[in-house]
């Protein structure tokens, strides 16, 4: 009788674990939705950067004071947003329940933001050097 109960419990455990398809590798839905939102914002940021690059190229051809002020203001806004995201990522990285996959995603998002901020500051310095 004990053998039958043990076999039944083991079979039930295997069925509940293996029969479920995971749509993502996150421990809970909140983490999945948060990272999905971060990735959406990164895509929007990339499009904004392409637009900003077009503005910089146009500014180099025909520099005006208004264009320079607009570009510098947009760069300052993007850098401030990156700083805000860095704070959120730092708080998330302090959690003790993250697995390796989640830690890797957070670290990569933070490093990407650092690289982007560094490049934006270089571009901003280059734009500020152009005489109007």
From Swiss-Prot:
<feature type="region of interest" description="Immunodominant conformational IgE-binding epitope">
    <location>
        <begin position="102"/>
        <end position="132"/>
    </location>
</feature>
<comment type="subunit">
    <text>Monomer. Trimer of homodimers. Oligomerizes in a concentration-dependent manner.</text>
</comment>
<dbReference type="InterPro" id="IPR020306">
    <property type="entry name" value="Mite_allergen_group-5/21"/>
</dbReference>
<keyword id="KW-0020">Allergen</keyword>
<dbReference type="InterPro" id="IPR038455">
    <property type="entry name" value="Mite_allergen_group-5/21_sf"/>
</dbReference>
<feature type="region of interest" description="Immunodominant conformational IgE-binding epitope">
    <location>
        <begin position="25"/>
        <end position="53"/>
    </location>
</feature>
<comment type="similarity">
    <text>Belongs to the mite group 5 allergen family.</text>
</comment>
<dbReference type="GO" id="GO:0042803">
    <property type="term" value="F:protein homodimerization activity"/>
</dbReference>
<dbReference type="GO" id="GO:0051259">
    <property type="term" value="P:protein complex oligomerization"/>
</dbReference>
<dbReference type="Pfam" id="PF11642">
    <property type="entry name" value="Blo-t-5"/>
</dbReference>
<protein>
    <recommendedName>
        <fullName>Mite allergen Der p 5</fullName>
    </recommendedName>
</protein>
């Amino acid at each position: 009788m004990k053998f039958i109960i043990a076999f039944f419990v083991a079979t039930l455990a295997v069925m509940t674990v293996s029969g479920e398809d995971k749509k993502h590798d996150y421990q809970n839905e909140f983490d999945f939705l948060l990272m999905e939102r971060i990735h959406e914002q990164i895509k929007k940021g990339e499009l904004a950067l392409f637009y900003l690059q077009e503005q910089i190229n146009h500014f180099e051809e025909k520099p005006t004071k208004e264009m320079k002020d607009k570009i510098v203001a947009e760069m300052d806004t993007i850098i401030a947003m990156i700083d805000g995201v860095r704070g959120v990522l730092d708080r998330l990285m302090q959690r003790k329940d993250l697995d390796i996959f989640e830690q890797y995603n957070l670290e990569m998002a933070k490093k990407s933001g650092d690289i982007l901020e560094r490049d934006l500051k270089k571009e901003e310095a280059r734009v500020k050097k152009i005489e109007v």
